[in-house]
Regions:
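Selected alpha-helical membrane-embedding segments in polytopic membrane proteins
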Residues: 2-97
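Membrane-helix interface segments in multi-pass membrane proteins
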Residues: 44-72, 117-140, 177-208
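Hydrophobic alpha-helical transmembrane segments and adjacent short intramembrane/lumenal linkers
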Residues: 83-84, 88-178
């Protein structure tokens, strides 16, 4: 459980945590990342279903669980691929599995804050939405800070180079998502075309 315990150390000692993560490369295991992912999905569902309605804007019955899971998994996967690709081009030292692990550790602030924010939302009304949004934004900034630290420390980059890598990674991630959406649209059109051909063939052969 050593690597899993690093997830909690990342809150207080992010630099040391990411150094320890890379130093334990020979003892690498994926299960801490899987556990963190499951925790992330769990707290996200709690947040979505139990957030106070005036702040949530949507009711629980309107939530598409599958879509919400995909909205977490796809960006995490795309970011891991993007940041690894860019750091590799920029002479980074991180392996892909370490990029995945660092990405998951960077989500720890959300794992820690989602449920407290959900509980706190029941003390807030719609007039307190700005304050709630500030707390949520602070959590997102915290995640961004951990991502920056992980890239800088684990690849031995300067701050300037790290910022450049992050910008390029975001652009590459956007490209991946755009290509993915294009492929999905093409696959959908192809499916509809094939289904139409089959329907026409059935009608021509059987009249139904």
């Amino acid at each position: 459980m050593h690597l899993f315990s690093l997830a909690f150390c990342v809150v207080r000692y992010p630099v040391d945590t990411f150094r320890a993560l890379q130093a334990s490369r020979d003892r690498f295991r994926y299960y801490p990342a899987v556990l963190l992912l499951l925790l992330l999905l769990a707290v996200r569902m709690v947040y979505l279903f139990f957030l106070h309605f005036p702040l949530a804007g949507t009711g629980a019955v309107e939530i598409n669980v599958t879509m919400e899971i995909l909205k977490l998994l796809i960006p995490l996967a795309a970011w891991s691929v993007s940041v690894f690709a860019v750091t590799s081009i920029m002479d980074g030292e991180t392996q892909f599995r370490e990029a995945v692990m660092a990405t998951m550790y960077a989500t720890v602030p959300y794992i820690l804050m989602a449920i407290p924010l959900t509980l706190l939302s029941h003390l807030f009304g719609s007039t307190d939405a700005a304050l709630f949004q500030i707390l949520l934004t602070a959590t997102e900034i915290w995640i961004g800070f951990l991502i920056l630290v992980s890239v800088m420390v684990m690849n031995n980059f300067s701050l300037k180079k790290t910022v450049l890598v992050l910008i390029l990674s975001i652009l590459f991630m956007a490209l991946i998502c755009a290509v993915g959406l294009l492929m999905f649209a093409l696959a959908s059109q192809l499916y509809q075309f094939i289904a139409g051909v089959i329907r026409e063939a059935k009608y021509a052969l059987f009249g139904t």
